[in-house]
UniProtKB/Swiss-Prot annotation:
Binding locations of Zn(2+) 2: 147, 150
Species of the source: Escherichia coli O139:H28 (strain E24377A / ETEC)
Stretch forming the signal peptide: 1-19
GO MF: metal ion binding; metalloendopeptidase activity; serine-type endopeptidase activity
Entry annotated with the keyword Zinc: yes
Disulfide bonds, paired cysteine numbers: 44-265, 187-235, 216-223
Gene that encodes it: mepA
Listed EC numbers: 3.4.24.-
Free-text function comment from the UniProt entry: Murein endopeptidase that cleaves the D-alanyl-meso-2,6-diamino-pimelyl amide bond that connects peptidoglycan strands. Likely plays a role in the removal of murein from the sacculus.
Name of the protein: Penicillin-insensitive murein endopeptidase
Alphabetized UniProt keyword annotations: Disulfide bond, Hydrolase, Metal-binding, Metalloprotease, Periplasm, Protease, Signal, Zinc
Cofactor: Zn(2+)
Length: 274
């Protein structure tokens, strides 16, 4: 499937339910031992943790949206990464969307983030902590040129390279999605230490943030992991294909309805949503 078709499918998936979804009616985590259920784009979570809003190492954006819930492994990853960043004097980590209290489908903006194992992190590290007003209405820093072929040199900082590398080297991380131009710059800057680049995957948009995805926890038996990324650093022909013009004759895919929920997620909805 060509890149344009994939982009359209992703857009349709993320906007298939712009009306409020039943998952938004669940305002607190579902009690129980932490269990990520289903796939990243069709699942839910029992026993989610709440990311502490107050931290000296990170700040949480758009708290009014209440998307700061996730599997305990995700909360620990955020705390671990932000502590590393702080200890290196790199700045404050800005945390975007995680998931809703019980996971599940958003009403727009995300096709994934459903099992409590995804988090968006801004690709900027302010030295001065943001105000409450800035956090509620954050201003993203677009690192990619208008033509989409490279990063803006005046905005690309060594600290951003280090932030992505630190995240990719974490034992629980399986994928990090960034814009192809950002992946390209990482390839240029990486030097001989390149194993971590395998986890960094080019994807549409993602011009101002990285989308970090964790592996399924070992005790979440109903969690569906993705296959591992292809071997290698991903800096060759695969990456360059993202910069090629779309092939002629590309057609818009038909709008698809969301797939059925995993049975455990449907049972959760039936029990907790009136």
């Amino acid at each position: 499937m060509n890149k344009t078709a994939i982009a359209l499918l992703a857009l349709l998936a993320s906007s298939a339910s712009l009306a409020a979804t039943p998952w938004q009616k669940i305002t607190q985590p579902v009690p129980g031992s932490a269990q990520s259920i289903g796939s990243f784009s069709n699942g839910c979570i029992v026993g989610a943790d709440t990311l502490p809003i107050q931290s000296e190492h990170y700040q949480v954006m758009r708290t009014d949206q209440r998307r700061y819930f996730g599997h305990p492994d995700l909360v620990m990853f955020i705390q671990r990464l932000s502590s590393q960043v702080s200890n290196l004097g790199m700045g404050t980590v800005l945390i975007g969307d995680m998931g809703m209290p019980a996971g599940g489908r958003f009403n727009g903006g995300h096709a994934s983030h459903q099992t409590g194992l995804d988090v968006d992190i801004f690709l900027q590290l302010p030295k001065t902590r943001w105000t409450s007003a800035q956090l509620l209405r954050p201003q993203a820093l677009d690192l990619v040129s208008r033509d989409g072929k490279h990063v803006v040199s005046t905005l690309w900082k060594p600290e951003i390279f280090s932030l992505i590398k630190l995240a990719a080297q974490d034992k629980d991380v399986t994928r990090i999605f960034v814009n192809p131009a950002i992946k390209q710059q990482l390839c240029l800057d990486a030097g001989t230490d390149r194993d971590w680049l395998r986890k960094v995957r080019p994807w549409f948009q993602h011009r101002a943030h990285m989308h970090v995805r964790l592996r399924c926890p070992a005790d979440s038996l109903e969690c569906e992991d993705q296959p591992l990324p292809p071997p290698g650093d991903g800096c060759g022909a695969e990456l360059q294909s993202w910069f090629e013009p779309p092939k002629p004759g590309t057609t818009k895919p038909e709008k698809k309805t969301p797939p059925p929920l995993p049975p455990s997620c449907q049972a959760l909805l039936d029990e907790h949503v009136i």
